[in-house]
Amino acid sequence: MARKKAALDFEQSLADLQTLVERLENGELSLEDSLTAFEQGIGLTRDCQAALAQAEQKVQILLERDGELAEQPFDAEQPE
């Protein structure tokens, strides 16, 4: 369940970030609102980057064999 929550949190953060970017690009926000949105966007970006880094670490751990890391490119088409 923790994995689903983490995935949902990442997806929600990414969706929120996309919404903020659209609002900023629209150009209808005041300077103060733009700065607030920008600050929120920075926080969401950091959250997303942290989630991606954590996912990358998990993938590397799963690929570990015989005490050595065997890095392999991710291939979504490759059967498990």
UniProtKB/Swiss-Prot annotation:
One Pfam family hit: Exonuc_VII_S
Enzyme Commission number(s) from the entry: 3.1.11.6
Molecular functions per Gene Ontology: exodeoxyribonuclease VII activity
Keywords in alphabetical order: Cytoplasm, Exonuclease, Hydrolase, Nuclease
Broad EC category: hydrolase
Localization, UniProt: Cytoplasm
GO aspect biological process, one term: DNA catabolic process
Catalytic reaction equation(s): Exonucleolytic cleavage in either 5'- to 3'- or 3'- to 5'-direction to yield nucleoside 5'-phosphates
Key word Hydrolase present: yes
Source superkingdom: Bacteria
Keyword Metal-binding: no
Main location: cytoplasm
Cellular component aspect of the GO annotation: cytosol; exodeoxyribonuclease VII complex
Function recorded in the entry: Bidirectionally degrades single-stranded DNA into large acid-insoluble oligonucleotides, which are then degraded further into small acid-soluble oligonucleotides.
Similarity comment: family membership: Belongs to the XseB family.
Subunit structure: Heterooligomer composed of large and small subunits.
HAMAP family noted in UniProt: Exonuc_7_S
Family matches, as NCBIfam families: PRK00977.1-4, xseB
Name the UniProt record assigns to this protein: Exodeoxyribonuclease 7 small subunit
Annotated organism of origin: Pseudomonas fluorescens (strain ATCC BAA-477 / NRRL B-23932 / Pf-5)
